[in-house]
Amino acid sequence: QRQMCIRDREVGGRPEAAAPVQAWNTEVPVERTLESDVTASDSRLLAVPANGRLSTEYFRTALFIGDSLSQGFALYAPTRDVATVCAYKSTSPNQVLQNFVGQRPDGSRIEMWDDIKVQSPSNIYVLYGTNALISQSDEAFLKYYSDLLDKLRERFAGVPIYVQSITPTTAEQGVKQPPLENGHIRLINNAIAKLAVSKGLYYLDAQEALADADGNLRGDYVGTYDGIHMNPTGYAAWADYILTHTVYSDYNKQFVTEGPYA
């Protein structure tokens, strides 16, 4: 029997596609037409705004796709044993496209795209970049990321896809590895935001929840020596940000606990 993503249970009931007008720092009902013409240069202007709050039950039908940063959603509350996590250590989009074997949070190994494509989520969260920025050019990373997002759109037609910002690192890590310096990460996030919205996907500015006033990973969220990965407190803050930055839909309405749709 083949191994699958770490999950709580099989899910279904995909909602109809929806796409909002996205505005920075504004809590309002959001709508947007697909395939938008994107001209904003600041990713915050393209991000999903605050929009009430959903309960953690929302995560039972969510799928997280990414690298070891996304693996934390399988390890820590409130998403552990709730969300489905298809995240693989030291992974970049080109490896997923080529169906390389990846290492899951529990240490087992599986062909990555084969693992992802059999899922039936109601919402998808995608995050790549930390490994790719170190191992390849920015242009190559963005091209492969674009191709992967197209592949996800085709496979999961009608399912809302949230493309998350690359998360901040510590200032010290940025000195050690210049591609992961937060000023550079912000530039790449601007490109990712444009890419996502131009494809009719949603852009989630996780930096807003995880960065300090200087744009570095908050000290109380740092979880490992590498200045990249986070502790349970950081993941709890990240998950809370997701629950307060979702797009309204008839499907999501069942999880609303406060806000304009409560």
Regions found by a protein language model. Name each.
Residues 2-6:
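Short, small-residue-biased leader/transition segments that mark boundaries at the very start
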Residues 14-61:
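N-terminal low-complexity, Pro/Thr/Ser-rich intrinsically disordered segments
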Residues 52-143:
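Conserved SGNH/GDSL esterase-like catalytic core that processes O-acyl groups on lipids
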Residues 59-61, 119-124, 156-161, 199-202:
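Loop/turn elements at helix/coil->beta-strand transitions in domains of secreted/extracellular proteins
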Residues 74, 129, 146, 150-157, ...:
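Sec-exported extracytoplasmic/periplasmic mature domains
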Residues 127, 164-165:
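Alpha/beta-hydrolase-fold catalytic nucleophile elbow
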Residues 139-148, 185-186:
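Charged helix-capping and loop-helix junction motifs
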Residues 169-262:
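Catalytic His-Asp segment of secreted/periplasmic serine-dependent ester chemistry enzymes
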